A protein has these predicted regions:
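Short, hydrophobic/π-rich interface segment
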Residues: 37-40, 65-78
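Helix-loop-beta hinge of the Bergerat
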Residues: 2-27, 31
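Short beta-strand/loop element within the Bergerat-fold HATPase_c
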Residues: 52-68
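Conserved ATP-binding N-box helix of the HATPase_c
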Residues: 26-54
Length: 105
């Protein structure tokens, strides 16, 4: 399964989904698997009740989600990564970062 497959499945269950994939460098297989696992966790936490999911992969990995009552909080992930959470209108921006990195909005 690929990120494109996951995006198609989300569309099939009624979640508006976009995938903007233009990394500035090659992503290792471990990072791609972490991105997919993180997306799966986001969907499960929101009980698949989302209006939209925008996935942006460039120099950072960002998930913008809308339409959930679930509160997302920043947390550590495996492999020395963390998920930085920002509240945005109608949802959240979740940014996958190396531990210790911070992105200013």
């Amino acid at each position: 399964i690929s990120l494109q497959d996951m995006a198609k499945c989300m569309k099939n269950i009624g979640i508006r989904t976009s995938l903007d994939f233009c990394p500035i460098s090659n992503l290792g297989p471990e990072l791609i698997l972490l991105i997919m696992k993180t997306l799966e966790e986001i969907l499960e936490e929101a009980d698949f009740r989302l209006t939209s999911v925008a996935i942006q992969i460039s120099d950072t990995v960002c998930f913008e989600i809308t339409g959930t009552d679930h509160e997302f909080v920043s947390r550590s992930l495996e492999g020395g990564y963390g998920l930085q959470t920002e509240k945005i209108p109608a949802g959240y921006r979740l940014i996958l970062l190396k531990e210790g990195e911070v992105v200013q909005s």
